[in-house]
UniProtKB/Swiss-Prot annotation:
Entry's family note: Belongs to the universal ribosomal protein uS15 family.
Species whose genome carries this gene: Leptospira biflexa serovar Patoc (strain Patoc 1 / ATCC 23582 / Paris)
Assembly notes: Part of the 30S ribosomal subunit. Forms a bridge to the 50S subunit in the 70S ribosome, contacting the 23S rRNA.
Gene3D superfamilies: 6.10.250.3130, S15/NS1, RNA-binding
Cellular component GO terms held in the UniProt record: cytosolic small ribosomal subunit
Protein name: Small ribosomal subunit protein uS15
GO molecular function: rRNA binding; structural constituent of ribosome
UniProt function note: One of the primary rRNA binding proteins, it binds directly to 16S rRNA where it helps nucleate assembly of the platform of the 30S subunit by binding and bridging several RNA helices of the 16S rRNA. Forms an intersubunit bridge (bridge B4) with the 23S rRNA of the 50S subunit in the ribosome.
GO biological process, one term: translation
Amino acid sequence: MITKEQKQQIIATFGSKPNDTGSAEVQIALLDSRIKDLTEHFKANKKDFHSRRGLIAMVNQRKSLLEYLKRSNLESYKKLIEKLGLRK
């Protein structure tokens, strides 16, 4: 679970303005943080299939947002991939 402070830090790091929560970069970074938290959860709870379905939905949402960002702003896409350490 992401705390309020962690969320604000992610928004400050990836957003263009202090309250920029809707840009693709911020949405991708927030999803990435939630995905990392859930993968840690699954190391201890291997049979939690209900949450695994939510994880798959988040991964697909992140994938579609990354594709959108790549189409619309390639330079921002490359910077974000490098900052988050994604394999692309």
